[in-house]
Amino acid sequence: MILPQEFYFEDTTLVAQSLLGKVLNIRTDSGIQKARIIETEAYLGIEDPACHTFEDRRTERTKSMYLDGGHSYVYMIYGMYFCLNFVTRTHQHPEAVLIRAVEPLPAQENLRKKDLKTNGPGKLCKYYGITRKHDGLKLWKKSSDLYVTDEDFKVSKKQIIPTARVGVDYAGEAAKWPLRFYLRDHLFVSKK
């Protein structure tokens, strides 16, 4: 079942946790590729110094953050890596969830950590060819190049590990907020 747009209107921290175990569907030249979401980070808009929309900063890059929840927000970091986010809440509350790691489906056996290609936000975008052309897409539409489904993969609260976000030291105390979530003991987690 495709997640409806209303799924993304909920509290961003809740959406970040609820996305764990859901399936990202990526339309490519070779068909639909699927990946289970393993790790996320919540970014809480104008009150969050780690968020691109902190203090209501509006730029060409952040335009998609000011759409209603359920749209994609893709930006470049370090001049070479793209990062995929899902916009949450409504256009009055520009918040998002960063997709930090996914597991390609169908799952493969006997993988080693050094062989993983989707255990980081830049790595997963490179692997699936996600770029700025994927910015602003409607994640609740099956016709979109990116959409998210619930395929009955159950995740209990005990399986979800909350911890500090990665790479946001510039945000002061907000860097320590426990807004990164990942599935306990999962091989594809980017950092423990």
UniProtKB/Swiss-Prot annotation:
Domain of life the protein comes from: Bacteria
UniProt-listed Enzyme Commission number(s): 3.2.2.-
Keyword Transcription regulation: no
Protein name: Putative 3-methyladenine DNA glycosylase
Keywords assigned by UniProt, alphabetized: DNA damage, DNA repair, Hydrolase
Family note: Belongs to the DNA glycosylase MPG family.
GO annotation, biological process: base-excision repair
Keyword Chloroplast: no
CDD domains in the record: AAG (cd00540)
Enzyme class: hydrolase
Stored Pfam families: Pur_DNA_glyco
GO MF terms, alphabetically ordered: alkylbase DNA N-glycosylase activity; DNA binding
